[in-house]
Amino acid sequence: MATIMIGSMAISVPNTHVSRASNSVMPVQAVQMAKQVPSARGVLYTLKREGSTQVIKHEEALRKFQEAFDQDVGIQRRLLVNKHSSIQSTKEGWFDLASLNFRAGSSKEAAIARRKQEEEDFLNGKYEQQFYAGVSATKSMKFEGGSVGFRTKYWRPTPKKTKERRATSQCRKPTYVLEEVLSIASKSGKLVEFITGKGKRVKVCYVRKHGAILPKFSLPHEEGKYIHQELQYASTYEFLPYICMFAKYKSINADDITYGDSGLLFDERSSLTTNHTKLPYFVVRGRRNGKLVNALEVVENMEDIQHYSQNPEAQFFRGWKKVFDKMPPHVENHECTIDFTNEQCGELAAAISQSIFPVKKLSCKQCRQHIKHLSWEEYKQFLLAHMGCHGAEWETFQEIDGMRYVKRVIETSTAENASLQTSLEIVRLTQNYKSTHMLQIQDINKALMKGPSVTQSELEQASKQLLAMTQWWKNHMALTDEDALKVFRNKRSSKALLNPSLLCDNQLDKNGNFVWGERGRHSKRFFANYFEEVVPSEGYSKYVIRTNPNGQRELAIGSLIVPLDFERARMALQGKSVTREPITMSCISRQDGNFVYPCCCVTHDDGKAFYSELKSPTKRHLVIGTSGDPKYIDLPATDADRMYIAKEGFCYLNIFLAMLVNVNEDEAKDFTKMVRDVIVPRLGKWPTMLDVATAAYMLTVFHPETRNAELPRILVDHACQTMHVIDSFGSLTVGYHVLKAGTVNQLIQFASNDLQSEMKFYRVGGEVQQRMKCETALITSIFKPKRMIQILENDPYILLMGLVSPSILIHMYRMKHFEKGVELWISKEHSVAKIFIILGQLTKRVAANDVLLEQLEMISETSERFMSILEDCPQAPHSYKTAKDLLTMYIEGKASNNQLVENGFVDMNDKLYMAYEKNLLRSLEAGMARIKLVGKIFYNMAIEKICSTYGEMFDKESCRRKQRIFRKLCECVLHECPVTPKKCKKYTFPKM
C-alpha cells in the first residue's frame, strides 16, 4: 500500500491489477485507507531525536563558550602571564605565584615557539648536509670579475604578443541543448514543453512508474477533451528518440497498465510496443475490448475506450493538494501531526466550501456561472438562505475547532441594517435642509444605512462628521447652578452589587471559590510584565511606602505579620490619617447640569465626606467591591506560593484583572493580549482616569460581558490629585475620599467629553505637576552645562518644554545646547537629533522677530512638525508624554483660535502671554544670578586679560578701535545671540 501525503490527510491508493477492461469506476474501500497506528519504534525514534537535539544544543553551547573564552583578550593575557610565572614559597610556609609582566611572558612564549619550530625542522630533515671541522667559511675579498651589460638608457623590453585564441563552441551538435534539457528533466522531474507548430504544444515529464523512469505525455482526455487522435505522430516523431534516450525501462507487461498510466511512452525495447502497435513508439491511452490503445493512432469509436487517466478522486485531491500547499498560514509555531481521519478532514473542507461557495457540483459550469452573475446583495441573500436551510448541519459544525469563526464571518459580512424605517425617518426630517449640522447628520445616516457594505472612505467621512457634531455640541453646553454642593448627597449603597460570574455554580469549586480556568493561564501576561513578586523571606518593609512624585501612601502589607500579643494586635488596626479634605467642586461630576453620582465621591447622610478607613491586607487575593463588604477572590493558582504587587505606575492593572473575572474562558487569550499589546503601551505609566476609562470602554466593545464587572476599591487623594486603586495589601493611610463607581460600566462614564469633572484628569497613582517640574528642570539647567548634558543623554524631550517661551529658546541657542544634542543623538536616534535641528532653526526665526505674539505664532505653526517627528521617537523617557501633551495643546489651541478668528472673535490672551513671559524671564535672571562664583571670576579674568593684551598692542590714539574689538570679543565670551548682538556693558573701559 502506498501513502500519498496531501496537506494534513493521508489517502491510501492501492496498486490495482487490471486484467480486463471495465466501464465501472472502482470505489475506494475503507480497508484501503491509511490508518495511523502508534508504534514503539516511532516513540523510540522520537526520544532518540530529542536526545540528539539536546546533545547538539549542549555541544553548540560549549563551542560558543570556548569561542568567547578564546576571544577575550584580558583572559588570554592573564593565562599567558600565569603560564610563565614561577612558584615561590613565602616566609609563612605558603606558596605564591611570582607574576611576570606581559612583555617577559610574551618573550618566553616566543622563545618556546622558536625552539619547538627548530626541533620540528630538525626532525623533518630541514637542515644542511655539511660538515664543519674547525674551519669557518669566509667570503673571499679578491675581485674575480663579473658580468657587464651593454644596455643603454634608451633600452626598453620588447612587449610580448598575445596570441588570439578563438572560443570553441560548446554546442558540438544541433541536438546538444535538447539532450541537456531532457537529461536535467529526467533527473528533476521538471515539465518540458515542445512547440511543434502554431498553437500546437506537447508537454512531457519523467515519472517513476512500475519501478522504472518513464516519459509521460499530457493527453487531452486527462483534461476532459476527447478526440480521435490525441498525438500527431508526424509532428512528434523527431523528438521521440531523444525523449526515450533518457528513460530507464524495465520489463512491463500489458496487464500492469492501469489507471493513472495515460501518456506513458514506450519504444521498441518494450513488448508493449511490439505487441500493440505497428508504429515504433507506443503512448498509453487506455483499453478497448481488453487491448491497449495507442494515443498516436486514430480511433473511430471513442466511446468504447476506457481511458487510463487518474480516477476522479485522485484528480480532485491532486488539485486540492496543489493549491493547499501554496497557501499555508504565515505563522508556524508548531510541528504538524495527524490528529484527524481523512473522513473528518473531508467534512471540514466540504463545510467551508459549501458555506462560502454553495454549489451542487464543483465541476458544473452552470453552478459557477449562477454565482458569478449574482450581484453583491443577491450573493449575501443567497448565503443567508443557504445557511438557514442547513441550520441543523451548522449546529454540528460548530463543534469543530474554528468553525464558529467561519460562521461569524459569514453572518457579519451578510448582516444588513434592520432599522431602515428609522433611517428613512431621519432622511425625511433632514431633507431640504442645507445647514452644516443637517448635512453632517445626512452623511452619518448614509453610512449607517449601508451597514457592512459601507466603504472605508464613507466610514471615515461619517466619523469626521460625527466628531464635528460632537465638538459643536460640546461648545454649546451650559453650566448649571453654583450652589450644588449645598444639596449634594451621594450616600454609600447599603446593598452589595451582585456579580453573576461569582454566583454561577459552574464557575465555583466545591469550596465556593471562583475557578479561573483558562483565564488563570492567560493572566500570566499581566503578572509577568506589570507585577513584581513579593518575597516574604526578604521582609515587607520595602513595600510599605508606596511613593509617587506628589506624595506617598503607606500600605498595610506589614500587618501580614500578626503579633500574638492582643495589645500589639489592636495597634495594627489603627491607621495613619492624611489631611481630611471637605466636599468641594472637585469631588463632583456633572453632565447636562445633573450630577453623575457614580463619578462622585461618597458622602454621609448629612452631606459630609465619607473618609476611607484602614484596609486590612490579605496574601493572595483580588479584592473587589466598593459598596458593602469586599469580595475576596483567590488569585490564579498558577503559582500557589507567590504574592504579587503592581509595579510603580501600573496599579490600574488591578482594574483589568477584575474585568478578567467576567471574560468568557474562550476569549481570555484575546482579552489579555489586547491589554498587553494595545492598551498598556498606550496608557503607559501614571495615566489619567480619562484614559483608563477610555481603555475600559474599548475593552467592553470587544468583550461586552465585562461591563458589569466589579471594580477594586478606588480612593481619591485630592491633595495630590491622584486616585489609588487598592489591591489585596490594603492601605495603612486613611482619610481619603472614596469613589462611588462600583462597576466598569459606571467607570466608563469618566471617558465622556461632556462630563464636567476634575477627577477625570487625576492620575491613577501618578503625578499631575510633571509639566511644571520639567520646565523648572530645564530653566535651572540652562546655565549649568553638566546638568544639561545629563538631561540631553537621559531625557532629551525636556528641551521641548522650551517652546513655552521664546526667551528660553534663545538662551538655549546661545549656550549651544541644541548643537550638543545633535552631537549626542545623531549616532543613536536620527529622529531625536532632527528635533534639535528644528529647534535651532525655529530659534533663529524667533530671534529675528521682536513681537511676542508673532513669536508664539511661529512656535504654534511648528508644533505639528514636532508632533510628527515625536511619533517616531523612543517613548522610554519620562518626559515623552509631557512633551506630547504640550504639543497637543499648541495644535488644538491653534485650531480653535483659527476657528474663532474665522467666526469674527478675537483672542484676548495676549496680556496673559506677556505676564507669563515676564515670570519666565525672572526665573532665567535668577538662574543667571546663581552662576557659580568660579564662573564669574573666570569671565572677569578673561576680560582683564583681553583688555591688558590689547592695551599693549595699541597706542592711546586708537582707543576707539580698541573698544570696538574688545566689545566683539566680549560678545563671544558672554555667548551673545549671533542674530541680535548687543553691546557689552559689563565693563567700563579705562581712559587712555
Swiss-Prot record:
Family: Belongs to the potyviridae P3N-PIPO polyprotein family.
Site for Cleavage, residues: 308-309, 765-766
Active site (record annotation): 221, 230, 262, 651, 724
Name of the protein in its database record: P3N-PIPO polyprotein
UniProt key word rRNA-binding: no
Organism encoding this protein: Soybean mosaic virus (strain G2) (SMV)
EC number: 3.4.21.-, 3.4.22.45
Lineage of producing organism: Viruses, Riboviria, Orthornavirae, Pisuviricota, Stelpaviricetes
Sequence motif Involved in virions binding and aphid transmission, location on chain: 617-619
PTM section of the record: Potyviral RNA is expressed as two polyproteins which undergo post-translational proteolytic processing. Genome polyprotein is processed by NIa-pro, P1 and HC-pro proteinases resulting in the production of at least ten individual proteins. P3N-PIPO is cleaved by P1 and HC-pro proteinases resulting in the production of three individual proteins. The P1 proteinase and the HC-pro cleave only their respective C-termini autocatalytically.
